């Protein structure tokens, strides 16, 4: 059970970091913070289940390029946020996160959970309970991340969008470097 809790925390860290950036950028209240937290939690819960059932064959195929995909997605969205933070006035900025962008972020931050699902065969745990714990942990940390990010964003106003973009690029770079060198 300890392995499962540690796995849940580890898998939720990327979503937590992205949530900090979203909170800083969009300044969500408690109710609005539920949307990204639910999305990240659901994807983090579904992906290991998918990995568990689809198994080693699919993981071997996707693991050859998943880190490039995650890096590319996060870097593009991060660069877009930085560009908008530097070039747009306060009135020109979008006040909400699009469903499409949230979906892409949810997929990008949960790709590692897909691979982790294969490893659930190696530890003696109930896969459905495991995925539920992973989903709940990610939901909770993402929710807190959005709220804490909002607080940080209130302190740095315009820089919040730039900070959010830098965080996304940083997470993408971390994913890429981990897969290339570790």
UniProtKB/Swiss-Prot annotation:
- Please give the InterPro entries that the UniProt record associates with this protein: Mntp/YtaF (IPR003810), Put_MntP (IPR022929)
From the record, give the transmembrane residue ranges. Answer: 4-24, 42-62, 63-83, 103-123, 127-147, 162-182
Primary localization: membrane
| Annotated compartments | Cell inner membrane
HAMAP family to which the protein is assigned, alphabetical: MntP_pump
Species per Swiss-Prot/TrEMBL record: Wolinella succinogenes (strain ATCC 29543 / DSM 1740 / CCUG 13145 / JCM 31913 / LMG 7466 / NCTC 11488 / FDC 602W) (Vibrio succinogenes)
UniProt keywords, alphabetically: Cell inner membrane, Cell membrane, Ion transport, Manganese, Membrane, Transmembrane, Transmembrane helix, Transport
The keyword Manganese is assigned to this record: yes
Cellular component per GO, a single term: plasma membrane
What does the protein in this record do?
Answer: Probably functions as a manganese efflux pump.
Q: Which domain of life is it from?
A: Bacteria
Q: Which Pfam families match?
A: Mntp
UniProt similarity note: Belongs to the MntP (TC 9.B.29) family.
* UniProt-recorded Gene Ontology molecular function terms: manganese ion transmembrane transporter activity
> How does this chain sit within the bilayer?
Multi-pass membrane protein
What name has this protein been given in UniProt? Putative manganese efflux pump MntP 1
Keyword Cell membrane: yes or no? yes
């Amino acid at each position: 059970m300890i392995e499962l809790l540690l796995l849940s925390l580890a898998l939720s860290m990327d979503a937590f970091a992205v949530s900090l950036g979203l909170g800083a950028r969009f300044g969500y209240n408690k109710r609005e913070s539920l949307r990204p937290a639910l999305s990240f939690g659901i994807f983090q819960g579904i992906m290991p289940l998918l990995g568990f059932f689809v198994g080693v064959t699919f993981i071997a195929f996707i693991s050859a390029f998943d880190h490039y995909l995650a890096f590319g997605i996060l870097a593009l969205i991060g660069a877009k946020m930085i560009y908008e933070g530097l070039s747009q006035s306060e009135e020109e900025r979008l006040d909400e996160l699009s469903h499409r962008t949230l979906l892409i972020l949810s997929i990008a931050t949960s790709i590692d959970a897909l691979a982790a699902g294969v490893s659930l065969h190696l530890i003696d745990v109930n896969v459905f309970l495991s995925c539920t714990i992973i989903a709940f942990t990610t939901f909770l940390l993402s929710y807190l991340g959005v709220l804490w990010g909002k607080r940080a964003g209130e302190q740095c106003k315009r820089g919040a969008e730039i900070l959010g973009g830098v965080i996304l690029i940083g997470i993408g770079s971390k994913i890429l470097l981990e897969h290339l060198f570790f």
